[in-house]
């Protein structure tokens, strides 16, 4: 169940990232069209690349958060706890045997 939730969250993050990249490309294209000099066009292209890289970094960050959530909320089988449920050694006082 948790892995399915993680996959769905990852798919949502991927869709959001693609929208952000598409928006950055459209905005960059508009800026390049409005630019008059080669220098302005180059600056617009650099801003477009920067926004795309930021969107990809956000995707990786959200995927890491989803993976961390999956580890925190991991399912334990009954009787298989992560801590000892009883004493593991002999319960006799030293020197009594």
UniProtKB/Swiss-Prot annotation:
The keyword Coiled coil applies. Keywords: Coiled coil, Stress response. Residues 1-97 are annotated as: Disordered. Transmembrane segments: none annotated. One of its GO terms (cellular component) is cytosol. Induction: By dehydration stress. It comes from the Eukaryota. Residues 34-63 form a coiled coil. Signal peptide: none annotated. Pfam families: LEA_1. InterPro entries: LEA_1. Residues 1-19, 42-68 have a biased composition (Basic and acidic residues). One of its GO terms (biological process) is response to water deprivation. Involved dehydration tolerance. Involved in the adaptive response of vascular plants to withstand water deficit. May possess chaperone-like activity under water deficit. Binds to negatively charged membranes of liposomes. This binding induces partial folding of the largely unstructured LEA18 protein, vesicle aggregation, and leakage of soluble content from liposomes. Under water deficit, the N-terminal region is necessary and sufficient for conformational transition from disordered to alpha-helix folding. This conformational transition is required for chaperone-like activity under water limitation. Belongs to the LEA type 1 family. PANTHER family: LATE EMBRYOGENESIS ABUNDANT PROTEIN 18, LATE EMBRYOGENESIS ABUNDANT PROTEIN 6-RELATED. This is Late embryogenesis abundant protein 18.
């Amino acid at each position: 169940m948790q892995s399915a939730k993680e996959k769905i969250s990852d798919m949502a993050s991927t869709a959001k990232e693609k929208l952000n990249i598409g928006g950055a490309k459209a905005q960059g294209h508009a800026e390049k069209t409005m630019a008059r000099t080669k220098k302005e066009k180059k600056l617009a292209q650099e801003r477009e690349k920067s926004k795309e890289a930021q969107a990809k970094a956000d995707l990786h960050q959200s995927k890491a958060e989803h993976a961390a959530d999956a580890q925190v909320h991991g399912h334990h089988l009954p009787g298989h706890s992560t801590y000892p449920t009883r004493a593991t050694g002999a319960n006799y006082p030293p020197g009594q045997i």
